[in-house]
Amino acid sequence: VTARDLNGPARNELKTLSKDNAEQVARHLAMAARLIDDDPALAHEHALAASRSAGRIAVVRETVAVTAYTIGDFALALRELRTYRRISGKDDQIALMVDSERGVGRPDRALEVGRAVDRSTLPVDVRVELAIAMSGARLDLGETDRALQELDIPELDPDRAFSWSPALFAARAAVLEELGRDEEAAQWQHRADVAAAAIGEQDADSETMEIDEIDEIELDDDAEEDLAPDASAETATADSAPDGDADRA
């Protein structure tokens, strides 16, 4: 792994460091990104190593927060997310903050954190992630009807698939199941599966895909019929959607 394996925007944040230090920190961050799915604990160790050498860099604190969240250290994730927010001035990890408050057993506080943000200023994908996290906090409080209301957002379009659609559809399915509306829950879970398969097909056809690219795919009737519980979606028409930035519920 070399410093070049780290994405460009993150490398740019390291320019205030000495050349040798920037190289070392970049390698740790690149390793954290590479390992987070397969070995989150080791990814977290690399993030902590980067933090020891570059604790005032926003992307470093963000990486510590994300890896801490992944291993279930929600208290550390919260501290690091607050620091990241203060350094960067960004709210793009607000959904993770809400979920981390849930993780430490404070769903009421999670709702306060989510409500304090002007959602109209957020990128679309972040807005969707926040809605999912807020819905989860409502479930934690036993407010199932209000959990469903949190997901009633303009982005909930059953006929089109964006990059955020599978998670949003699946979240709605889970809440409907909690409400005992099993038939509706199954329909939304099916839509989630169709959307995920369609997006997966498009990704497979693309040589490269920017991490912050938002893709829109029309979900036609044939695609939904083709995706039986044991089959794969075969038909989807890909279109471009509005730009957005990439952030978990």
PLM regions and their residue ranges:
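Alpha-helical segment of the N-proximal tetratricopeptide repeat
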Residues: 16-45, 49-52, 63
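Intrinsically disordered, low-complexity mixed-charge segments
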Residues: 177-235
